[in-house]
Amino acid sequence: CLGQTFENDSARRLYYLGLLAKRLQDPAFRQQEGFPTGTDEAILAMSDPPYYTACPNPWLAEFVAHYGKPYDPSAKYSREPLAIDVSVGKTDAIYKAHSYHTKVPHLAIVPSILHYTNPGDVVLDGFSGSGMTGVAAQWCGTAPSGYRFELEQAWKKAGRAAPQWGARRAVLNDLSPAATFIGA
């Protein structure tokens, strides 16, 4: 977790909750635009730091520094536009796990992530809703061989190079409390 190892998830959560509790005492931290009006206890109860906080996440920059890579203006980056069918995957078990009014199946998002990013890249979804972009980012590294084969064949038929498989790291954010909890 951000370069640290913990005995278990509870130990990680307790450690970061302690750091968040200290951070909540900083008046400058609380002055940020959009900071919730909730009590410290409520913010801590709804948070699972460093992954999810019910206030501006103080570990976001550290996450990006740890998992991301600096922008290199000399690195060549060029991608053709990609048009895909976003109705694929509506019968998948992951898609059916919960309902959300604007949900797009993760299987419909995977091709876009594969096309526009490389393994290890950080993907930002500022309107994450159901969290399917996060699922898709991980799926790029864990997709079953059958799915990989089908997608590679479709891309080959369309004249595209084979995708670079490998997980991407997702940063998910949403203004909706329901969406935020689903994405977490």
What is the role of each PLM region?
Residues C1-Q25, A178:
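Amphipathic alpha-helical packing elements
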Residues C1-T5, A45, G183-A184:
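Charged, low-complexity surface segments at secondary-structure and domain boundaries
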